[in-house]
Structures are given as structure tokens and as C-alpha cells.
Amino acid sequence: FQDPYASLHPNHTLWRTLAEPLKIRGEREIEKRVQTALEQVGLPFDAARRYPHQLSGGQRQRVVIARALLLRPQLLLLDEPTSALDMSVQAEILNLLNQLKLEHQMTYLLVSHDADVIAHMSDRAALMSEGKIQRFFDRDAMEKGEHRMD
């Protein structure tokens, strides 16, 4: 997630990128699952014929999210999910991730240096410094801005 430009093989179509994990696991209805995953992240099914260089950064991030959802995880690690994106695309991706979390009843483990991203995405947070947890925050504390390191 951290770098959508490096996360996708440049010589593979999106179809190959998305279908491959399903084939490895012996899943059925691969075409339907790929189509559903793309639609869930706001991309048309015909995008599966494209290569990564034909997509914007936000579209690439959506493909990476779709790939993660294909295997129906209960827990998803989001490592700086918007760090390589401009501000308007960041908001779109964060809102999409929140929507998908609710729809799929997933838990996210979010890693971010951005206090606003943490507040927008989290019910609980832990502040780490020098490799150790320094403090925990709940939703109320984050709404009051107590999670900031200013």
C-alpha cells in the first residue's frame, strides 16, 4: 500500500495481477470475483485489460486495495496507505477504505505518521516512539486532538 507505483508489476495486466492469487488458492469464479473487487473500489471491469502505467496513482492504489480484498481477509495491514498520493486522492482513498471496512467487517491495522489520517480512520490508536508504545488513544481523545505529537 505504501507505494502504489512499486506495488504492481509493470508488465502484467491488472487482470493477471488480480487473478493470480485466486488461481494459486484454487478459487472458483475468478472472473466474477475480479469484476466485483474492481467495482468495489470504483473501477470498471474493463480496467482489467490495462497495465499499471496506464493508471493514475489513485487508480493504482485502488487496484492494490482490490487485490487485498480478493482473499477476503479479516485483518488488513495499511502501511501509509495514502503517503504517495496528492491530498484530493488521499481523501477518496481513506473514505473508500472506511466504507470497505464496514461492508466487509474487517479490522485495519493502520501505520501512519499523519495524525489526521489516524483520527479519520481509527477507533483506537497507539503512539509509538523509538520502537515502543508511549500512549493509547480512544476515539474521544483523538477528536480532542490528544493524539498529536505537536
Give, region by region, the residue ranges found by the protein language model.
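ABC-type ATPase nucleotide-binding domains, specifically the catalytic core motifs of the NBD
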Residues: Y5, H12-I30, G42
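Conserved ABC ATPase "signature" region
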Residues: E31-D46
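Conserved ABC ATPase signature
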Residues: Y51-L55, Q59
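Hydrophobic anchor residue at the start of the ABC signature
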Residues: I65, I93
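A short, proline-enriched helix->beta-strand linker immediately N-terminal to the Walker B motif
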Residues: L70-Q74
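A short, surface-exposed alpha-helical micro-motif characterized by mixed small hydrophobic
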Residues: I118-H120
